[in-house]
Amino acid sequence: MSHVLEVTEIHTFIGQFHILEGVSLEVPDGSITALLGRNGAGKTTTLKSILGLTPPSKGTITFNGEEIQGQRTHHIAARGIGYVPEHRAIFRDLSVEENLKIAERRKGDLARRADFIFDLFPDLKRLIKLPGGNLSGGQQQMLAIARALVPENVLLLIDEPSEGLAPVIIEQVMEAVRQLSAHATVLLVEQNFLMASQLADRYTIIEAGKSVKTGMMAALVDDEETIRRYLGAA
């Protein structure tokens, strides 16, 4: 099995705080891998460490066979890694079209990818001239995911896509992630275990900055002890 991403024993500090104290994970090509754990476990910091936003001080991060830790964020992104942050980083005063265009790495990316993107997110085509701030929370999340697809990324890091959304909208977001996984490998941080269990093939659990368990999602669903110990209320 080939792995698009391999993270090995990374340690990351934010200021004087030792946030990640030995996180390892593997993301197989073509998979949806869920990064699970309680609030504050280090999941978002792991994504930011992969991207170089909070560079690790120790350990290795390998993308498509090449080590990328220590590289600048824009160099890492240019290799084909897209990021959808937790708080839907869209420009509220710009139109949907302008939000998409600003995500281009090369001139014409949106034109080349438009059919693919609007097949996944037909509502965005209908709303193309509306300001981002006029969209519903679910539509803004779709736009945030679509922005990460404007360049031809092979790995998408998606942070808490269901955060703050109504159940009916969560279903729409889940369907979008399912569809895009046919075109890109996904590393998903998701606090909603039901959503993660229905989407992901594999999982890694982080507890207090350390990876503590990894495996197939189908087995985790029936592992009540692991769910209670690492994913239940603290």
Predicted regions and their residues:
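Conserved structural motif at the start of ABC-family nucleotide-binding domains
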Residues: L5-V7, L20
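The feature captures the beta-strand-to-loop junction immediately N-terminal to the Walker
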Residues: L36-R38
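Helix-to-loop junction immediately C-terminal to a conserved catalytic motif
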Residues: L51
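ABC ATPase NBD coupling module
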Residues: P55, E67-R88, A114, R126-K129, ...
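ABC ATPase signature
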Residues: L94, L135, A148-L149
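Conserved ABC ATPase signature
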Residues: P131-L135, Q139
